[in-house]
């Protein structure tokens, strides 16, 4: 489990609890997700490489350290993953953005791809995949397999909630992918939804049923 990080910062846990409440409006849910994604981005980007840069302060010249956001790609698993993007782009505005569309077959719970669009040169970039939920793990596994065809430099997966079976599925299929989550919930129900969970993240973000 060395590639699994649970982000336990008090602000993360506070905002996640507010999001879980069934009476949270779509507006509140979106706002909280944006705030949470910024907080989680701090931990997820902790090991990003720095490059020396010469700058002028008001008093003298110095050498500072900067990250190269242009070497980073954020990949949203549609549609709920889009809720993560604004917050993360606030932290790393130079990042490129890709999208993969996957839907879950209600009969088999397997992921079916319907859209895939990535920036050029992904083989020279580190990649962060965002999706609020790691449930069965099927969508995450399918996404990683598709991304690896483009040979990105590295892949991280970021979610709000995960369950043990989803974590195990992703780790077994892609042990090189680092997983970041705000919480590990108890289990999946018979329909593949996380318990206690927070409901359908996409519906709650966009106010749909």
UniProtKB/Swiss-Prot annotation:
Catalysed reactions, as listed in the record:
UMP + diphosphate = 5-phospho-alpha-D-ribose 1-diphosphate + uracil
Pathway assigned to this chain's UniProt record: Pyrimidine metabolism; UMP biosynthesis via salvage pathway; UMP from uracil: step 1/1
* Family matches, as InterPro entries: PRibTrfase_dom, PRTase-like, Upp_B, UPRTase/APRTase, Ura_phspho_trans
Instruction: Kindly list the cysteine pairs connected by disulfide bridges.
Output: none
The molecular function terms in GO held by this entry are: GTP binding; magnesium ion binding; uracil phosphoribosyltransferase activity
Q: Which residues bind 5-phospho-alpha-D-ribose 1-diphosphate?
A: 79, 104, 131-139, 200
Provide the binding site for uracil. Answer: 194, 199-201
What sort of enzyme, by top EC class, is this? transferase
Xref: SUPFAM superfamilies: PRTase-like
GO biological processes: UMP salvage; uracil salvage
Task: Explain how, and how many, cofactor molecules are bound.
Answer: Binds 1 Mg(2+) ion per subunit. The magnesium is bound as Mg-PRPP.
The cofactor(s) it depends on are:
Mg(2+)
Please summarize the record's notes on activators and inhibitors of this protein: Allosterically activated by GTP.
Sorted keywords for this record are: Allosteric enzyme, Glycosyltransferase, GTP-binding, Magnesium, Nucleotide-binding, Transferase
Q: What is its EC number?
A: 2.4.2.9
Annotated Pfam families: UPRTase
Q: What protein family does this chain belong to?
A: Belongs to the UPRTase family.
What does this protein's UniProt record list under function?
Catalyzes the conversion of uracil and 5-phospho-alpha-D-ribose 1-diphosphate (PRPP) to UMP and diphosphate.
**HAMAP family linked to this entry:** Upp_B (MF_01218_B)
Q: What is the protein name for this chain?
A: Uracil phosphoribosyltransferase
* Biological source species: Verminephrobacter eiseniae (strain EF01-2)
């Amino acid at each position: 489990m060395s590639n699994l990080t649970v982000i336990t910062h008090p602000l993360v846990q506070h905002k996640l609890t507010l999001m879980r409440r069934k009476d949270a409006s779509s507006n509140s849910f979106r706002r909280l997700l944006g705030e949470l994604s910024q907080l989680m981005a701090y931990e997820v980007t902790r090991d990003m490489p720095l490059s020396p840069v010469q700058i002028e302060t008001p008093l003298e010249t110095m050498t500072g350290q900067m990250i190269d956001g242009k070497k980073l790609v954020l990949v949203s698993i549609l549609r709920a993953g889009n809720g993560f993007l604004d917050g993360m782009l606030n932290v790393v505005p130079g990042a490129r953005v890709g999208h993969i569309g996957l839907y879950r077959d209600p009969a088999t719970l397997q992921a079916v791809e319907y859209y895939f669009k990535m920036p050029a040169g992904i083989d020279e970039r580190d990649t962060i995949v965002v999706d609020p939920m790691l449930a069965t793990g099927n969508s995450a596994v399918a996404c990683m397999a598709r991304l690896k065809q483009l040979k990105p430099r590295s892949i991280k997966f970021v979610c709000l909630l995960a369950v043990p079976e989803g974590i195990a599925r992703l780790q077994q299929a892609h042990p090189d992918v680092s997983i970041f989550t705000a919480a590990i919930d108890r289990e999946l129900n018979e329909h593949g939804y996380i318990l206690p969970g927070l409901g359908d993240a996409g519906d709650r973000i966009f106010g749909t049923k």
